[in-house]
Amino acid sequence: AVGTDYNRVNLLMAVLEKRMGVRMADCDAYVNVAGGMRVVEPALDLALVAALLSSYHNRSLQDGMLLFGEVGLVGEVRAVSQAERRVAEAIKTGYTVCVLPESNRASIENAGNLDTQKIKLIGVRHVRELLDCAGL
């Protein structure tokens, strides 16, 4: 793992195996954060899980999709800070779909500060939901 915590990647692979039955023990996982950056915040978890599932199932995520959220040991997707700001930046940079923790989605829509017509917000409570909403 380059640019992120190796132990966190292993933990997320263990969550996929235990909670979703995805056989990760036989797989090698290579993770690289582009641009030489180092990202250690838990909001990266959901995107890492989606990337691992994408590779495992040999299916690409849809174009224009952004994912963020912390993943817990039982596969629950936890809220992260600065969610509204993250979505605002996603809109500015042209993303069309954002998969995020359900509690963050509800807060953003209730606040009404963002034009949610420009981006589809998909709230998830558990990593299992990625299979449907991300096409995996």
Give the positions of each predicted feature.
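Peripheral, non-AAA+ core regions of ATP-driven protein-machinery
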Residues: 2-136
